[in-house]
Curated annotation (Swiss-Prot):
Pathway annotation from the record: Pyrimidine metabolism; CTP biosynthesis via de novo pathway; CTP from UDP: step 2/2
Binding-site list for ATP: 14-19, 71
Binding site for UTP: 13, 186-191, 222
Listed name of the protein: CTP synthase
EC number annotated for this UniProt entry: 6.3.4.2
Region annotated Amidoligase domain, chain positions: 1-265
Gene that encodes the chain: pyrG
GO biological-process terms attached to the record: 'de novo' CTP biosynthetic process; pyrimidine nucleobase biosynthetic process
Length: 543
């Protein structure tokens, strides 16, 4: 019988509801409970797949091919549960399904309203997403008081009532600001945020109070008094030097005990030794490398959230401080590759569209010609193929049809036919919808023996997640191979290029998939660990 923990936020956005939820879930998992997490997004987009990275940040791809909120990446990094398309839904998705049923006649001519039809659909999706977990954390996006969040808050109010107090509780994150001129923290914003919640029938059971300064006992007592929350359930969460400390911070204040007692769960004590090891390795590195990351969304680094975290995980696994030097690919176009000098390795991540592509291609050429370790991901592989065709084969007009549909040598092109998650053949074209029409989710990849990528993974077959609609053109591939390009990874059926390497180079690997989506702080990821080791070797060669 699943218990539900609803998580809301107040005062301001971006308080870290996702990380707080994932951290509590990690503690409960460490106590032997089966946990899952859901993210409910109030925006009207059906999913974040076509949203600008500058507005939304990263689109996290699940194993089953859903394009979801980046918080699901936090969830998978903190718990062992694999998220699916059922772990994230939006207002747009809810309305789309309700309207489809209305058109089909499922409501028998009823007037479709927010209550009960929209709220019932939200509740149905929460219950479905929770599955058979012991505890389901349900994070409501946005801030209490936002008009967009109201149907979700009403739905969880109803669900709390329906399942009963022994199976549902509410955690509310708020901000306790520090006023420097007064020299004290202020509790009034938290009081008003809880007042807003209570006005719609929701009484928090726990408050997690975010602050950049310590919150003293008297302030916590004051918050408890004015919000009708137990004093021990007012949890102080100050800024920390690594997010992987947060499970220990919450555990030290007894948050998991409050949950277990409330739900009457029989479970063991929490063993957080894995997290202590992660934090120790993160904060006490023995080595250091600098890696140039050449991207096109550098104004909002959340666009590369999983990738940045994955590089940190590789540092943890190698006891190495990984300093990422963020370089906008357009700056390389304007200022040249001198921006890359001094880097121990070069990383080119994915992206869409023509802007900044020539800067990425220049970064690839610099890495290849100067024997600097290189890792390309998704577009980072495609630009590596383009660079090789131009500068090794001499095809000056080589390009991707994404950027130049009439180029003379389209070494990367739109794949027009493949199988969807059900095994059915799906045909697509340039005129297909942009949303939900990519090669998405986990796919098998066969690795070549004696390759750098095979050495990293230590096995012949891997499963990695994809998010792209362009592939290496098989018609021109033989020319690339003849010129020395090595194809060291192919799709399970052998039809598509998944990994390339360059001969006579210390470490040059580019992959079509996104390995960052499966990297975790406790386990790391073999490809990123191999990349950091290559950067360490490069640094030693330069010394």
């Amino acid at each position: 019988m699943t218990r539900y923990i609803f998580v809301t936020g107040g005062v301001v956005s971006s308080l870290g509801k996702g990380i707080a939820s994932a951290s509590l879930a990690a503690i409960l998992e460490a106590r032997g409970l089966k946990v899952t997490l859901l993210k409910l997004d109030p925006y009207i987009n059906v999913d974040p797949g076509t949203m600008s990275p500058f507005q939304h940040g990263e689109v996290f791809v699940t194993h089953d091919g859903a394009e979801t909120d980046l918080d699901l990446g936090h969830y998978e990094r903190f718990v062992r549960t694999t998220m699916t398309r059922n772990n994230n839904f939006t207002t747009g998705r809810v309305y789309e399904d309700v309207l489809r049923r209305e058109r089909r006649g499922d409501y028998l001519g009823a007037t479709i309203q927010v209550i009960p039809h929209i709220t019932d659909e939200i509740k149905r999706r929460i219950i479905k997403g929770a599955g058979n977990a012991d505890v389901a954390m349900v994070e409501i996006g946005g801030t209490v008081g936002d008009i967009e969040s109201q149907p979700f808050l009403e739905a969880i109010r109803q669900l709390r009532l329906e399942v009963g107090a022994k199976r549902a509780m509410l955690i509310h994150l708020t901000l306790v600001p520090y006023i420097a001129t007064a020299g004290e923290t202020k509790t009034k914003p938290t009081q008003h945020s809880v007042k807003e919640l209570r006005s719609i029938g929701l009484q928090p059971d726990v408050l997690i109070c975010r602050s950049d300064h310590p919150i003293d006992i008297s302030s916590r007592r004051k918050i408890a008094l004015f919000t009708n929350v137990e004093e021990r359930a007012v949890i102080a969460l100050e800024d920390v030097d690594t997010i992987y400390k947060i499970p220990s911070v919450l555990h030290a204040q007894g948050l998991d005990d409050i949950v277990v007692e409330r739900f009457g769960l029989a479970c063991g004590s929490a063993d957080l030794s894995e997290w202590e090891r992660v934090v120790d390795a993160k904060l006490h590195p023995e080595k250091e490398v600098t890696i140039a990351m050449v991207g096109k969304y550098m104004e909002l680094l959340d666009a590369y959230k999983s990738l940045i975290e994955a590089m940190g995980h590789a540092g943890i696994q190698n006891r190495t401080r990984v300093n990422l030097r963020y370089i906008d690919s357009e700056d390389i176009e304007n200022q040249g590759t001198a921006l890359l000098e001094g880097a121990d390795a070069i990383l080119v991540p994915g992206g869409f569209g023509l802007r900044g592509v020539e800067g990425k291609i220049a970064a690839v050429r610099y890495a290849r010609e100067n024997k600097v370790p290189y890792l390309g991901i998704c577009l980072g592989m495609q630009v590596a193929v383009i660079e090789y065709a131009r500068d090794v084969l001499g095809w000056a007009d080589a390009n991707s049809t994404e950027f130049d549909k009439s180029c003379g040598h389209p070494v990367v092109g739109l794949i027009t036919e493949w199988q969807d998650a059900t095994g059915a053949t799906e045909v697509r074209s340039e005129s297909s919808d942009l949303g939900g029409t990519m090669r998405l989710g986990a796919q098998e990849c066969q690795l070549e023996a004696n390759s750098q990528v095979r050495q990293c993974y230590g096995k012949d077959e891997v499963v990695e997640r994809h998010r792209h609609r362009y592939e290496v053109n098989n018609n021109l591939l033989p020319h690339l191979i003849e010129a020395g390009l090595k194809v060291t990874g192919r799709s399970g059926d052998g039809a598509l290029v998944e990994v390339i390497e360059v001969a006579d180079h210390p470490w040059f690997v580019a992959c079509q998939f996104h390995p960052e989506f499966t990297s975790t702080p406790r386990d790391g990821h073999p490809l990123f660990s191999g990349f950091v080791n290559a950067a360490l070797a490069q640094k030693a060669r330069k010394a």
